């Protein structure tokens, strides 16, 4: 299921199925992961944010629900199972006349199956599932639940339309180099210089899950820009604060992408991202909307 960013993509896909086809979607906690400690500040934890599921008005089934879980487990062998291909988690499943056209490939079809009930698994990291209505709903949720501590409220009150948010993801990215790219100071400077060419930058606000790991990158960037570290917030506080910006330079973190998706400025924002954020990215990917600025890698430009 992943962290909050991945969970929001999965909810956006469920919302897409509900809006487009009228499906009644239920979020199933097959992973058995614990409900999130929304006051926690540990970025390593990958918990389930059930309060957002409830806010989006989806049904939810988990092992602790007893009878409902028992019914699901008995029914599960008789459900057709559709599973997203590992290399296609950002490829939009276009809709057409068939009610299965927006489903990933069929992975299991029991000889006896229940009609009109399906099990679907995947990440669905395409901007095309993220409707404006859904993004507004997530922002409204954050605005209703978050009360910033004094230090972060001071940061929020100092933001202007010239401010820029940047986000460094390290943590589990460093543990899985076969999947994730690590973007350093060079990527962020390219993005910042691009934004500065359009409008001056007053301050650059830095978000990260591991500031110790990016000290050398920040030292390089600070030679050109005035940096402000955003530290000490919960996951919700960081995402809420991230949504208060109008300008962003981002890398491979879905958490940061959702901060931009939920910006209070809606689509009237400037966002710089890498064209290929993952090592297994493809030309078919639809991570980012077309108005976001996508940077090619330096070696591809030189070639």
Language-model segments: residues:
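Short, flexible loop/turn elements at secondary-structure junctions
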Residues: 2-3, 31, 124, 170-172, ...
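Short amphipathic alpha-helix
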Residues: 10-17
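Short, aromatic/basic amphipathic alpha-helical patches
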Residues: 35-55, 213-224, 282-289
